[in-house]
């Protein structure tokens, strides 16, 4: 395999692209455009699972612009909810929260003292479909896992929520 090298310019280009895409999301045609140019793979399996469980747990990686999952979920009648990590700038946090909720996804702000796990359990049982970024732990409670020959910290939340509720985890990615 080809060894990947860190390229600061590419990081800046990708970050700029993310912000431009995020600003573009405020365009009213966003949902139609994304839906027209997106293919949801295995949506029949998701529909079968929805008949068996009130809500589902979708495990997503930090890959692409995950707001694009909103029209995909809308197309197959999912009632989406996601957890956002708190930001130090409340103005930016509230702007992102309002933007995402205007696109059709409920946002819960996680963090210390928020009782996020119990809230997610209640929402899941009541029929919400939960999108959780699952490729990195944002606090010290993650599980150490060997990942590409290195030790990485992954969040416990998706697995713990699945075990407690009996709801399956649906690995999800957008490419």
Predicted regions and their residues:
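Soluble catalytic domains of membrane acyltransferases
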Residues: 26-175
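Negatively charged linear elements and acidic catalytic determinants
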Residues: 1-38
């Amino acid at each position: 395999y080809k060894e990947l090298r860190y390229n600061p310019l590419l990081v800046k280009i990708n970050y700029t692209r993310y912000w431009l895409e995020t600003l573009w999301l405020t365009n009213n045609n966003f949902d139609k455009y994304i839906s027209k140019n997106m293919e949801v793979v295995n949506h029949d399996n998701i529909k079968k699972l929805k008949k068996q469980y009130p809500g589902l747990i979708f495990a997503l990686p930090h890959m692409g612009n995950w707001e694009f999952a909103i029209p995909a979920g809308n197309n197959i009648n999912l009632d989406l909810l996601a957890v956002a990590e708190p930001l130090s700038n409340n103005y930016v946090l509230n702007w992102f929260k309002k933007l995402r909720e205007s696109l059709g996804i409920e946002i819960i702000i996680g963090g210390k003292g928020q009782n996020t796990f119990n809230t997610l359990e209640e929402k899941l049982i009541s029929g919400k479909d939960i999108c959780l970024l699952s490729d990195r732990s944002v606090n010290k409670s993650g599980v150490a896992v060997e990942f590409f020959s290195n030790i990485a910290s992954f969040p416990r939340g998706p697995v713990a929520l699945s075990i407690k509720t009996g709801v399956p985890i649906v690995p999800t990615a957008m490419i």
